[in-house]
């Protein structure tokens, strides 16, 4: 086994000992320590192209951009193969898969044994968060995938900067990854919160293989956050600047396919001249209490790992600008001359394409050319609307926390929580409706507390209790809101136009956070009332707005029954104050129905 010239660029005995131990287990032909330099990026990219792992795109149209086909069986996160390996099953809770830690190390160790024979082991040091921030966490990912090493170089602050931050400390996340034989039968993503360790084998896909992202920044970090008194959340962070120059910051949690990246990169409508929205982060937020008693947030990531289909100049022009250079596209469609395409792009499909499986594709085919979960990995600095505070080690002060799911009925356009506990209740019961394709039953609500269901690194009830406990730590807490852009008419049409027009709802929330907007009290929370939203220049009927904001008592009685089933699933660790919130709301709804 050889080690590359950038050999062992650290004297940290804890790190060196662990890398040697993992090399002994995986048996690579050579070890390469990543330094994060541009020269290294070029060298690794050339290696990946030579190995046909990456395909260069037309460098005139897409400078510095490359294409990657994944194995067709390896195209998404695999929740059923993702495990939380706490000492007891109760610590993982009823919403996570659990594996006993010793058994997990034994089972995965047998797959890792010799898995890197004939391959290079890349040692990828990285920092999540601005490198000088008190928020920052160091991780080391060992991987046999050059694709993963290059993606980590985009998604995190990678290389020497991480080793400098680490020094001789033993406090780093130990991440071991191997594609191995990419066999779904031998695919496991295991998290060991007590050991600050992640082992992932059998997948090269982003969320399973880029261990800094969901694995460390959410699953492991949520456990660390509980113990250390902060929050690690599946939230975008955006900066809103008013025409007068006032800047406010919000964090927002939406489950997948609910427009998180679009909201983070929103362009306000023409009716809002002078307003600017800038992106601090599009996916993950780490929040701590500042010296001023407010909640301060950083984006631990350094890039965007976005879903390509549906992204276009209308829905998200800033995302389209972000992917113009130095981006890796995974499982989209491409043309033989080095262009790319996906469903929902601005122009129609070319007559002929190479689809995401590498097969010829003709216009009119019933098969999708790009995989529905095809992705782009783009540097955050490419975003023309990035916030200048994105690298600020202090983070940004959060005025409002927003929760939102995809509900075609029941949930109104916007609600403000009565208080922190009520806000945690709204977040704990949020969710999205399944489609017929997913379950055979349309409209079944999949609860997704704080959009964190697949990402909580310990028991869900204890996680919700941690949210409640945070109230006593935050003297000046942000206001909490619930939004729903997706309510439909009886004919199945969206009632609210969404996209840039979500600025109208955001403005009301910002004004409420600043204490300068009126609100109407309802049994569900505070709403804008008839005149609270700025609707000038909006081509939507009054009836549609009324339907989008309506509170239907019959629907809410059903909703609360469904919430009871969800709370029952959480078991004995469900915080009593949340059960009480549901009971009080049920009483209010029933009393209001009797009055009617």
From Swiss-Prot:
The keyword Ribosomal protein does not apply. The active site is at 258. Binds 1 Mn(2+) ion per subunit. One of its GO terms (biological process) is response to starvation. PROSITE patterns: PEPCK_GTP. It is an enzyme of class 4 (lyase). InterPro entries: PEP_carboxykin_GTP_CS, PEP_carboxykinase_C, PEP_carboxykinase_GTP, PEP_carboxykinase_GTP_C, PEP_carboxykinase_GTP_N, PEP_carboxykinase_N. Its main location: cytoplasm. GTP binds at residues 257-262, 375, 406, 499-502. Residues 362-388 are annotated as: Disordered. GO terms for molecular function: GTP binding; manganese ion binding; phosphoenolpyruvate carboxykinase (GTP) activity. It is found in: Cytoplasm. Mn(2+) binds at residues 214, 234, 283. Its EC number is 4.1.1.32. Signal peptide: none annotated. It comes from the Bacteria. GO terms for cellular component: cytosol. It catalyses: oxaloacetate + GTP = phosphoenolpyruvate + GDP + CO2. The keyword Manganese applies. Pathway: Carbohydrate biosynthesis; gluconeogenesis. PANTHER family: PHOSPHOENOLPYRUVATE CARBOXYKINASE, PHOSPHOENOLPYRUVATE CARBOXYKINASE [GTP]-RELATED. Monomer. This is Phosphoenolpyruvate carboxykinase [GTP]. It comes from Anaeromyxobacter dehalogenans (strain 2CP-C).
């Amino acid at each position: 086994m050889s080690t590359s010239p950038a050999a062992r660029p650290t004297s940290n005995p804890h790190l060196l000992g662990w890398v040697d131990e993992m090399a002994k287990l995986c048996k690579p032909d050579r070890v390469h320590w990543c330094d994060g330099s541009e020269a290294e990026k070029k060298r690794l990219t050339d290696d990946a192209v030579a190995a046909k792992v990456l395909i260069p795109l037309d460098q005139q149209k897409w400078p510095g951009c490359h294409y990657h086909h994944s194995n067709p069986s390896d195209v998404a996160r695999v929740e059923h193969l993702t495990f939380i390996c706490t000492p007891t099953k109760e610590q993982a809770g009823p919403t996570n898969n659990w594996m006993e830690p010793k058994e997990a190390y034994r089972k995965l160790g047998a797959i890792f044994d010799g898995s890197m024979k004939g391959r290079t082991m890349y040692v990828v040091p990285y920092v999540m968060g601005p490198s000088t921030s008190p928020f920052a966490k160091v991780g080391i990912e060992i991987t046999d995938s050059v694709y993963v090493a290059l993606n980590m170089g985009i998604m995190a602050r990678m290389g020497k900067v991480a080793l400098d931050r680490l020094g001789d400390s033993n406090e780093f996340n130990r991440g071991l990854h191997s594609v191995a034989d990419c066999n779904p039968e031998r695919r496991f993503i295991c998290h060991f919160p007590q050991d600050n360790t992640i082992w992932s084998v059998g997948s090269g896909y982003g969320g399973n293989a880029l261990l800094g992202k969901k694995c460390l920044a959410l699953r492991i970090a949520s456990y660390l956050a509980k113990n250390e008194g902060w929050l690690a959340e599946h939230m975008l962070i955006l900066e809103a600047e008013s025409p007068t120059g006032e800047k406010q910051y919000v964090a927002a949690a939406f489950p997948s396919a609910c427009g998180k990246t679009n909201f983070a990169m929103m362009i306000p409508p023409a009716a809002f001249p002078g307003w600017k929205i800038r992106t601090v982060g599009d996916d993950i937020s780490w929040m701590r209490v500042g010296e001023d008693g407010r909640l301060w947030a950083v984006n631990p990531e350094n890039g965007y790992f976005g879903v390509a289909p549906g992204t276009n100049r209308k829905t998200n022009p800033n995302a389209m600008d972000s992917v113009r250079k130095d981006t890796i596209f995974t499982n989209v469609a491409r043309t033989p001359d080095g262009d790319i395409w996906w469903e929902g792009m601005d122009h129609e499909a070319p007559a002929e394409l190479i689809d995401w499986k590498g097969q010829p594709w003709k216009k009119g085919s019933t098969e999708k050319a790009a995989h529905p979960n095809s992705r782009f990995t783009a540097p955050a600095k490419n975003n023309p609307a990035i916030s200048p505070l994105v690298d600020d080690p202090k983070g940004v002060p959060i005025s409002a926390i927003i929760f939102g799911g995809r509900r075609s009925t029941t949930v109104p356009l916007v609600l403000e929580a009565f208080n922190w506990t009520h806000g945690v209740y709204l977040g704990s019961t949020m969710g999205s409706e399944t489609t017929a394709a997913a379950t055979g039953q349309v409209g079944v609500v999949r609860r997704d507390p704080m959009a964190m269901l697949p990402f909580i690194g310990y028991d869900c009830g204890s996680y919700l209790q941690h949210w409640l406990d945070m109230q006593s730590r935050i003297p000046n807490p942000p206001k909490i809101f619930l939004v729903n852009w997706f309510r439909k008419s009886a004919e199945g049409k969206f009632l609210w136009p969404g996209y840039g027009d979500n600025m109208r709802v955001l403005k009301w929330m910002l004004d409420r956070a600043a204490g300068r907007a009126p609100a109407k009290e309802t049994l569900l929370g505070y709403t804008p009332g008839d005149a609270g939203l700025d609707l000038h220049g909006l081509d939507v009927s009054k009836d549609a707005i009324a339907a989008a904001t309506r509170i239907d008592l019959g629907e809410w009685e059903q909703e609360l029954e469904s919430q009871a089933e969800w709370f029952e699933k959480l078991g004995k660790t469900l915080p009593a104050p949340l059960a009480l919130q549901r009971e009080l709301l049920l009483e209010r709804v029933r009393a209001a129905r009797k009055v009617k």
